[in-house]
Amino acid sequence: HTAAADGSVKADLSVAKEMGGPGKPGTTTPEHLFAAGYAACFGGALDFVGKSHKKDASKARITCNVSIGPRELGGFGLAVKMHVEDKSIPQAELEALVKEAHEKICPYSHATRGNVDVQLEVVGG
């Protein structure tokens, strides 16, 4: 079980199947929580960047998939696939906004850079 210090988030946890755990139904994993936090943070960063370029990216759908697996040096590592979709913004413009949010604004992107493989998939209009 885990909970935020202020009680705003509570979750029953299980160990992911990839790590030899049961992956129990009705529970979550630390990877799920990381994915939710990263997606939420990235959404805020994208909205911030959009506003600075007079674009409304507040309705972008952001899906983050975090996987876990063995590392070459031992132990386990994470990999992230971030899917960003907003058909109201042209593809090239959305790609530029996502790139700026990822490279300059998002704290999760800063924290993972050089440590976690992050792949961005962008679908604009």
Locate each region found by the language model.
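Extended beta-strand/beta-hairpin segments
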Residues: 1-36, 43-125
